[in-house]
Amino acid sequence: TVAIGNVVVSPSEFLPRLFEQGGKLFNTKGRITVDTPEALTALKNYRETYACSDRTVHDIWKNVLEGFADGSAAMTVVFINYASHILNSKMSSIAGKLGFAPVPGGKPLSGGGVVGITRSCAHPETACAFLSWLYSNQTAPAFTLLGGLSPCRSAYSNRDIKERYPWLSAARRSFPSAQRRSGSAYYSNFSELQMENILAAYVQRAVLGVCTPEEALAQAQAEMDAHFTANSEFL
């Protein structure tokens, strides 16, 4: 199974392939550069991979895992915070039969949701105390066994956790090579979400065969150039 279908999923499939090729989203000045040879190779690989899948448009990773969990698909790539669904799913017929490995190319993405405290919080001290408890070494085993991802190193060496979620040990070894998304000071109106909206739209068109990879990247570059305004110091 291969994820495709929304503004988060499609870039998350495309970007590890781009980084594997040595490509980047921004040049040294911070200008968005998606119409490159590296991006073309990455997009072609994404398209070829999708052609070998069940060709279902999965818009979230939980749906991607359904075909894998019921045994109808042999392989999938997913963020580890979704992987616990494989074992928790009532459909799962593969418990105890799993293999796992770092993402091909060795350039996984670092991302995911986090818990935070809003500026308007009426009781910030209480909220901080809750987060201290939630992310403590004492809470980490239960938090992780329930499918969460703890920042505590102790969780990744816990025997019960390693037996239930064996891929977490491999995931921890991948953290140093994980790639993070970054912003850009090149533009006065830069928005990471808007950039991903544009990128996702054209990546999906290429993967689904609506246009060629070459056309998709050229059109994505043109739309980003038109949408984002460079700061005067870069003109």
Positions of the model-derived regions?
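Ligand-binding "clamshell"
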Residues: 17, 86-103, 165-169
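Short helix-initiation/N-cap motifs at beta->coil->alpha
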Residues: 56-70
